[in-house]
Amino acid sequence: MKSLLFCCLFGTFLATGMCLECEICIGLGLECNTWTKTCDANQDTCVTFQTEVIRAPVSLSLISKSCGTSDTCHLNYVETSPHNELTVKTKRTCCTGEECKTLPPPVLGHKVNPPNGLQCPGCLGLSSKECTEHLVSCRGSENQCLSIIGKEFGLFFRALSYKGCATESLCTLFEKRFWNVLEDVEVDFKCTPALPKSSQ
């Protein structure tokens, strides 16, 4: 409601000149039940995330839709690995207006990229702000070590701790606070360059 009031009062000063509305949802598979939200004044595009969680030979697909900012639309692919046998890949598409009704969802393959010679601490703790680290081999274009501590994940879990390899694009998305589909989430994160295996 606050974002709608702000947008309507000050909409004439926005670069878009209008109040943007986007579908919002998160769910398993390729579809999810959506509702419509009036985006904040600084959000000028709708974003669809298609995510694959891969632990060969099994993979899990998730989809989410939210408001976003167009300055991150070029960051359309991100990848992270918290474990040598687990990879999470996400592809994103941006749209506005009628285009969102016909734009097909982003498509991800199930292929896992090969190791690239870099390494990071890795771990995953659900419902906890701590996890036990082990060394993870980075894959593909993963050249950053990502560390996340999160809380207040609503229906999912109360806390999260995560460390692993990540693409530079994922670190940039965290800097832009891309997780607005879950409005109550609080996240602290840090990215540092991954090191060659011989340096660990």
Swiss-Prot record:
Its main location: secreted. Transmembrane segments: none annotated. It is found in: Secreted. Optimum temperature is 4-90 degrees Celsius. Weak decrease in activity at 100 degrees Celsius. CDD domains: TFP_LU_ECD_PINLYP_rpt2, TFP_LU_ECD_PLIGB. GO terms for cellular component: extracellular region. Expressed by the liver. It comes from the Eukaryota. It holds the Pfam family UPAR_LY6. Optimum pH is 4-12. Important decrease in activity at pH 2. Keywords: Disulfide bond, Phospholipase A2 inhibitor, Secreted, Signal. Disulfide bonds join C22-C46, C25-C32, C39-C67, C73-C94, C95-C100, C120-C145, C138-C165, C171-C191. GO terms for molecular function: phospholipase A2 inhibitor activity. Residues 1-19 form the signal peptide. InterPro entries: CNF-like_PLA2_Inhibitor, LY6_UPA_recep-like, PLipase_A2-inh_b-type, PLipase_A2_inh_N, Snake_toxin-like_sf. Heterotrimer of 2 subunits A and 1 subunit B; non-covalently linked. Inhibits the enzymatic activity of all phospholipase A2 tested, binding with micromole to nanomole affinity. Belongs to the CNF-like-inhibitor family. This is Phospholipase A2 inhibitor NAI. It comes from Notechis ater (Black tiger snake).
